[in-house]
């Protein structure tokens, strides 16, 4: 029988939100050329959603991006990003930048969609997503009742305070709460 702490983690019985950063070994890690981590992963678990990413993006048989949103009826919706070419992902908590060599395709099932000042807002029951598109990617900021009280304040703060800066050498997103991701 595993320790109860391990069972609690497996059943996700812990205080949220929480951010996990972890690495994964190579599948053939006994080979000298495959020393060190194969993947650097960030997972952010909030009460109504889970955002996860791999720093080097998707490729082969792995997905480098995952966003699962819980609906009021306990079903789950997932936002999907599709791109054929290489890309990289930066994530910190509820913020994410997806940057590639082509414009990605986003699939957004069952969300209410609204565009304000070049920002696409996706609304689910208790989760709100601001998508800031740019030429070869996008920045995401995700809100929920814990971070922004409601949808109206979330939209107001994002449109008034958030900033996306894209230049030849970097992409930087300043979130509605002032935190930055580069």
Where are these regions (language model features)?
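Ser/Thr/Asn(+Pro)-rich, low-complexity disordered segments
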Residues: 1-182
């Amino acid at each position: 029988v595993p320790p109860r702490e391990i069972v609690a983690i497996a059943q996700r019985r812990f205080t949220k939100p929480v951010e996990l950063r972890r690495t994964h070994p190579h599948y053939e890690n006994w080979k000298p050329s495959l020393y060190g981590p194969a993947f650097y992963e960030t997972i952010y678990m909030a009460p109504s959603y889970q955002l996860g990413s791999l720093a080097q993006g998707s490729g082969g048989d792995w997905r480098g991006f995952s966003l699962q949103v819980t609906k009021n009826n306990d079903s789950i919706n997932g936002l999907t990003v599709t791109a054929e070419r290489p890309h990289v992902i930066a994530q910190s908590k509820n913020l994410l930048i997806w940057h590639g060599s082509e414009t990605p395709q986003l699939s957004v099932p069952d969300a209410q969609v609204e565009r304000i000042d070049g920002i696409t807002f996706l609304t689910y029951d208790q989760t709100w997503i601001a998508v800031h598109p740019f030429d070869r990617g996008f920045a995401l900021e995700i809100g929920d009742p814990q971070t922004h009280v409601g949808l109206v304040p979330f939209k107001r703060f994002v449109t008034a305070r958030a900033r996306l800066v894209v230049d030849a050498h970097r992409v930087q997103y300043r979130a509605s709460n002032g935190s930055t991701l580069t």
